[in-house]
Amino acid sequence: MRADNIGNKVRVLSSMATVMADAAGVPVVAVGRIAGQYAKPRSRRTETRDGVELPSYRGDAVNGFEFTARARQHDPERLERMYRAAAETLELVAGTGRHLRVWASHEALLLDYEHSLTRVDERSQLPYDLSGHLVWLGERTRRLDGAHVAFLRSVHNPVGVKLGPSATAQQAVALA
C-alpha cells in the first residue's frame, strides 16, 4: 500500500506542476514532503500531563508519541529506521519514471542528521546537504542567530523559508 500511496502522490504532484506550467507559461518544479515527516519542531523541551513531566515528542525519528518515560527516551535506532524509510521512498520516486520528476523536501530540524548527510561536491568543491533536494527553515528554526540558519547558510542547496504571521519584512530580507 505504501508504494501505491507514494506513486499516487508523485503522479498528483507531477500533474499539478504540468497544469501550473501550462497555465503560467513558465517551468514549474514539483517539490513535496514526499518521504514522511519524522521530526517535529517543539517550542518546549518537556511537556507536563497530570503533574508528570516528560520530554516532548519530537517525531518518530527521535522518540515515541506515547506519554511514557520509556517512549519519550531518545532512541538512535529510530533515526536509522527513518533514514531507511526515506531512502526506500526516494527509490520508489525514482522508479516512477523520468517524466514524473518530483523533488524531495523537508524542514532541516535535526541538525546532527543534516550534518551527517552533508557532502562536498567533487567538481564544485561546495558542500550540499544530501538529506533532500530542498530543505527549509520553519517558524521555530528561522532565528537569524540560530544554528539552523547558520547550517543552511553553509550549504549550497536551494533553501526554503516558512514565513508565518509572526515574520516581519526585515526578517524575511535578512534571511535572503
Regions found by a protein language model. Name each.
Residues R2-A176:
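Active-site-facing alpha/beta catalytic cores
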